[in-house]
């Protein structure tokens, strides 16, 4: 508090300054304050006598006393940050109105210190603190700028304040100060802009204020903090589809700059750059552009790093990029399959496992070459090994992957040989609709067009595990769910159309399955009749039960 004490002392010893002409109440305030300062460890400066003494100096017309009060508040609040009331904030806000840069600097600093406390953040804005802070941001004094922006940055961490700040006129000067030559001002300004990107409405205000070109230009800044704030802000801005479209037309260098930052020596900059690319890759144009900009080598390297947040960011990014059909072969050729399969064992993060499986599923969507590469990389075996013991979210992704793979006739022999049916049957018992439905769909596809060469796998799994294919068909026939009944009937029809006498016998000689088919047929017939009797019934031709009835008739016709 030495600086404060010296400001309170007489300047008679310095011939450059005339003696201070003080009012009686000011002399008393100085005397009391000097006494409080001598015993500062036992004094509460935010109430009673100490606060009255400071307030007296604040309201003085003597600029030296105002400076002393501002400096005192700055130093006191640096050491004692807690919730304060209006009586404490009011004199500091008065000091903000001063035309003196020393008073402005110290008052902004004091307010910024108090703005670390959440309740104070709300009260400062409620008491009209934004307007004078915005004025001080536009000061020609760098120190005043720095403290004013720092205070705004702190205030912007409070959710209720963000919209008020966005609409206060603060964003344009913040964007301007983000280009300051003073690194402290830059950091504070970009940090404040980042704090304004956590809601869609505020992000739009930020875009309208012209902050995006500034943020993009600062991606090449040498300071890691500025890079971090800018990449994170842009990542948040890219969450919104409208903003992504605008970025694609106005910021042609954005992707290449973010790709370069994936190689930053700062892990948190790497992470945010990757997340920004992930958000951009929600759009198909960016999915292609990231690959063209050389993003794949960086991403494949990040998948095997030791920093979990980076791994998550990278696998989430490649998952989005893999959605585009043009990227599938390029991703495989870039060496992603092995690390992606390796991430399936990442038990510490369901999210990483989910993104890895989802990427593998995307890569298998459209090409026999890709599907065979997946199989050769051990993806199916690893999924089969894990699927019954992973969390539900991962299980859902794996079952969806199985459903996609089972659609491909070229892959069916390999899937049979991997004994995938051994895990599909238990998965059809899942209480989760997605897991159950995906697994049933995969099983149904594997029962379609069964060749003589592979009929052994149907026989092997007819009654095991868990009552096997037979049990699956019976449960779904009796489920009461039109979707599941449809899967069961379609599977039975596929088995019968394989034209294999032994497979047909499995169904023809099973009274439970035959009974289930006939019961459904009778039920659907009654439904059909009621619709005939009630011609005004809406959507009678779109009723899924019509399709169920048609399936039962096809099956019964084949069975004779």
Swiss-Prot record:
Q: Which Pfam families match?
A: Arm (PF00514)
| Chief localization | membrane
Covalently lipidated residues (N-myristoyl glycine) read 2
Residues with covalent lipid (S-palmitoyl cysteine) sit at 4-5, 7
Matching InterPro entries: ARM-like, ARM-type_fold, Armadillo, Vac8
Where do the ARM repeats lie? Answer: 39-76, 77-116, 118-157, 159-198, 200-239, 243-282, 284-323, 325-365, 409-448
Subcellular localization is given as: Vacuole membrane
**GO MF annotations in UniProt:** identical protein binding; protein-membrane adaptor activity
Keyword Signal found: no
Arranged from A to Z, the UniProt key words for this protein are:
Lipoprotein, Membrane, Myristate, Palmitate, Repeat, Vacuole
Report whether Repeat shows up as a keyword of the record: yes
Q: What does this gene product do?
A: Functions in both vacuole inheritance and protein targeting from the cytoplasm to vacuole.
This protein is called: Vacuolar protein 8
Q: Which organism is it from?
A: Debaryomyces hansenii (strain ATCC 36239 / CBS 767 / BCRC 21394 / JCM 1990 / NBRC 0083 / IGC 2968)
């Amino acid at each position: 508090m030495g600086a404060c004490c010296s400001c309170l002392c007489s300047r008679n010893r310095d011939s450059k300054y005339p003696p201070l002409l003080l009012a009686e109440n000011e002399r008393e305030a100085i005397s009391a304050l000097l006494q409080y300062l001598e015993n500062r460890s036992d004094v509460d400066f935010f109430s009673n006598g100490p606060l009255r003494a400071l307030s007296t100096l604040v309201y003085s017309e003597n600029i030296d006393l105002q400076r002393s009060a501002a400096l005192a508040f700055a130093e006191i609040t640096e050491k004692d940050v807690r919730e304060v009331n209006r009586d404490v904030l009011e004199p500091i806000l008065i000091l903000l109105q001063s035309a003196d840069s020393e008073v402005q600097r110290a008052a902004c600093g004091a307010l910024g210190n108090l703005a670390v406390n959440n309740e104070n953040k709300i009260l400062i804005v409620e008491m009209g603190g934004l307007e004078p802070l915005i004025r001080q941001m536009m000061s020609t004094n760098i120190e005043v700028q720095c403290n004013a922006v720092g205070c705004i940055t702190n205030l912007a961490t409070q959710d209720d304040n963000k919209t008020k700040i966005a609409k206060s006129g603060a964003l344009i000067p913040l964007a301007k100060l983000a280009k300051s030559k003073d690194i402290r001002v830059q950091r504070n300004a970009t940090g404040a802009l980042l704090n304004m990107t956590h809601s869609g409405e505020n992000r739009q205000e930020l875009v309208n204020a012209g902050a995006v070109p500034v943020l993009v230009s600062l991606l090449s800044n040498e300071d890691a903090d500025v890079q971090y704030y800018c990449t994170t802000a842009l990542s948040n801005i890219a969450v919104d589809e409208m903003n992504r479209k605008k970025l694609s037309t106005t910021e042609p260098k954005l992707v290449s700059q973010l790709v370069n930052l994936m190689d930053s020596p700062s892990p948190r900059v790497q992470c945010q750059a990757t997340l920004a690319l992930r958000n951009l890759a929600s759009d198909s144009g960016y999915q292609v552009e990231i690959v063209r900009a050389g993003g794949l080598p960086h991403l494949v390297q990040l998948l095997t790093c030791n920093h979990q947040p980076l791994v998550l960011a990278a696998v989430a990014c490649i998952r989005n990029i893999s959605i585009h059909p043009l990227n599938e072969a390029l991703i495989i050729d870039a060496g992603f399959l092995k690390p992606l399969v390796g991430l399936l064992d990442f038990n510490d993060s369901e999210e990483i496992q989910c993104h890895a499986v989802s990427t593998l599923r995307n890569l298998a969507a459209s090409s026999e070459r890709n599907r065979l590469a997946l199989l050769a990389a051990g993806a199916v075996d690893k999924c089969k090994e894990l699927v019954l013991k992973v969390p539900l979210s991962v299980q859902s992704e794996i079952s969806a992957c199985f459903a996609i793979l089972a659609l491909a006739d070229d892959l069916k022999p390999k899937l049979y040989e991997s004994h995938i049916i051994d895990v599909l049957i238990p998965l059809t018992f899942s209480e989760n609709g997605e897991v159950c439905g995906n697994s049933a769909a995969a099983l149904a596809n594997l029962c379609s067009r069964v060749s003589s060469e592979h009929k052994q796998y149907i026989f092997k799994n007819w009654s095991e595990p868990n009552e096997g294919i037979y049990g699956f068909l019976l449960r779904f026939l009796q489920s009461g769910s039109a979707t599941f009944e449809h899967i069961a009937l379609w599977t039975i029809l596929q088995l019968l159309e394989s034209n294999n006498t032994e497979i047909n016998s499995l169904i023809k000689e099973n009274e439970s399955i035959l009974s289930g088919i006939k019961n459904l047929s009778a039920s659907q017939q009654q439904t059909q009749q009621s619709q005939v009797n009630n011609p005004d019934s809406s959507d009678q031709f779109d009723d899924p039960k019509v399709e169920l009835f048609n399936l039962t008739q096809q099956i019964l016709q084949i069975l004779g």
